[in-house]
Amino acid sequence: SGSIIHSMEANVGYSPDKSQNMVLMGGLK
């Protein structure tokens, strides 16, 4: 899952709100 997390972070542009971004990505999934 590490690669997926990395890809997600790269997609959002390494935003400071990682937790929020993960929640948004999880919702989109």
Curated annotation (Swiss-Prot):
Similarity comment: Belongs to the complex I subunit 5 family.
Localization, UniProt: Plastid, Chloroplast thylakoid membrane
Transmembrane segments: 1-15
Complexes and interactors: NDH is composed of at least 16 different subunits, 5 of which are encoded in the nucleus.
A single GO molecular function term of this UniProt record: quinone binding
UniProt-listed Enzyme Commission number(s): 7.1.1.-
Protein name: NAD(P)H-quinone oxidoreductase subunit 5, chloroplastic
Membrane topology, as annotated: Multi-pass membrane protein
The protein's enzyme class: translocase
Superkingdom, taxonomy of origin: Eukaryota
UniProt function note: NDH shuttles electrons from NAD(P)H:plastoquinone, via FMN and iron-sulfur (Fe-S) centers, to quinones in the photosynthetic chain and possibly in a chloroplast respiratory chain. The immediate electron acceptor for the enzyme in this species is believed to be plastoquinone. Couples the redox reaction to proton translocation, and thus conserves the redox energy in a proton gradient.
A Gene Ontology term for the protein's cellular component: chloroplast thylakoid membrane
UniProt keyword DNA-binding, yes or no: no
Keywords: Chloroplast, Membrane, NAD, NADP, Plastid, Plastoquinone, Quinone, Thylakoid, Translocase, Transmembrane, Transmembrane helix, Transport
